[in-house]
Amino acid sequence: QFTFNEAISLEVRVSGQEQLDQVWAALVEGGEELPCGWLKDKYGLAWQITPTEYYDLLGKGDPEADSRLMSAVLKTIGKFNIAELQAAYKGS
């Protein structure tokens, strides 16, 4: 029997916390939350639900802010909180 693992995953880019929350809730039902904005659905397939705001911040070219953002990402268990990612990026 074939089982999924993290060697294959799908990314869904969402815009805003409301859309992130909706997509997350639909996919995680019967599955499990994982670190760094990842989840496994009820079939064991890994998903990363990523807000477009994350990529907007990374594209600004500030290495120190990028480092703070990545630190916040690595500390996240379950879904992202966009306001927390933005605060980490700003250093607040």
Regions found by a protein language model. Name each.
Residues 1-92:
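Glyoxalase I/VOC metalloenzyme domain signal
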